[in-house]
């Protein structure tokens, strides 16, 4: 599997970091995409190498088409793309829609939705047997917010993730006969840095009572689900959206 490539967008922290480490341990050459924190991305690469794996860090903003294209061209030089983890995503401070600026809404969609769609397009061009590929797995990152809508917290975030659900179902069916499987995870309250963006201090702990399992999830637990979707154990699974939310959705 030395020439099999896995791209993880937003791979320098949280769920992306956990997925990158596990993919590296599984034998993939991991392309760790990051936007600004080079030190964090380098730490992931170093950790993968220390465990006997291979990885490179590539800077790129998934809100910019040119950066996405450069990311995939760089990956092409390393081997055959087999896995895309569409993980890059952002949220903003708690707010109502009628108090949001257009710039905020557009930024959320540019990163969470359009970035994921363009990355998926580029992955299909490389994985699909229609284009001479040998198949592969795309794992999109949705959110429990796509289900409950995040009222009063950030409905634009929920909407951006709802679009990911539709992308997953539609694209999963579109390329099912071409060796490409497309699935999504819908994480609930996971203990990662993204919650800091909400502006709610201690948000993860505050949400525990709303979770049937009475605890937050971990990045590793989500990454384990990613690994299953990338493996042959899920070979008959495509166009599916799987909650990883402790029973909350």
Which residues make up each language-model segment?
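A short, exposed helix-loop element centered on a Lys and neighboring polar residues
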Residues: 120-121, 169
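The beta1-alpha1 cofactor-binding region of Rossmann-like NAD(H)/NADP(H)-dependent oxidoreductases
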Residues: 38, 59-70, 102, 220
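Catalytic loop of short-chain dehydrogenase/reductase
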Residues: 133-134, 139-163, 168-177, 189
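C-terminal substrate-recognition "lid" of short-chain dehydrogenase/reductases
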Residues: 215-244
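Conserved glycine-rich cofactor-binding loop
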Residues: 12-13
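Alpha-helical segment proximal to the catalytic Tyr-Lys
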Residues: 125, 173-177, 235
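Substrate-binding pocket helix/loop in short-chain dehydrogenase/reductase
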Residues: 95-97, 104-109, 207
